Amino acid sequence: AAVLGGTTAVLDFATQERGGTLVQAFDTWQEKARGCSCNYGFHMAIAEWNDKTAAELPEMTRRGVTSYKLYMVYDALRVDDGAIYAALKAAKNEGALIDVHCENWDVLNRRIQEVKARGLTGPAGHPLSRPAPVEAEAVARLMRIAELAGSPVYVVHLSTAEGLAEARRARARGQEVYLETCPQYLLLTDACYAAEDGVKFVMSPPL
């Protein structure tokens, strides 16, 4: 499908399962890619950080992995601030970059309950549970963790001006910070959630 659409290279996230290893995740995705007609590579998504995971990084480097994604959200994927700090330091030693999904998980879950209590259970409630400060606080926290680790860091799918401001403050302090956004955050607004097909626009972070 990628080649038919004119895409000649794909970088997919090979996601570690809780209780599993990075090597297992890499091998699983390698098997999925068997017979692929285009060039491909893998980012690694780390769902569990411990001494065993840290010890695997040199092997991942040998296999060509240069970036790892961490999540501040989702029970099956998120890691705590201490793990982010340790992973940043370990990745730097390998010349790799840590990418992070930034949202405050505890706060947004509280807000989900508040929104539900108001009777908002459809798409229109999604951005109310995840307003801009939910991302901005997580970005600010990540910037300080990276500062303490002395490591570069990459924020994925940045969606708010407030989050951008926090990253700019970190850069002004001399930190090495990389950012990305996505077309939907530049071209669409949360007004989409009020539409009849609003469910199509549910994503996290929201519009």
Name these PLM-found stretches.
Residues I46-D51:
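Active-site beta->alpha loop and helix N-cap motifs at the rims of alpha/beta catalytic domains
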Residues L11-A14, R18-G19, G41-M44, V156-H157:
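Active-site neighborhood of phospho(di)ester-bond hydrolases with catalytic His/Asp-centered motifs
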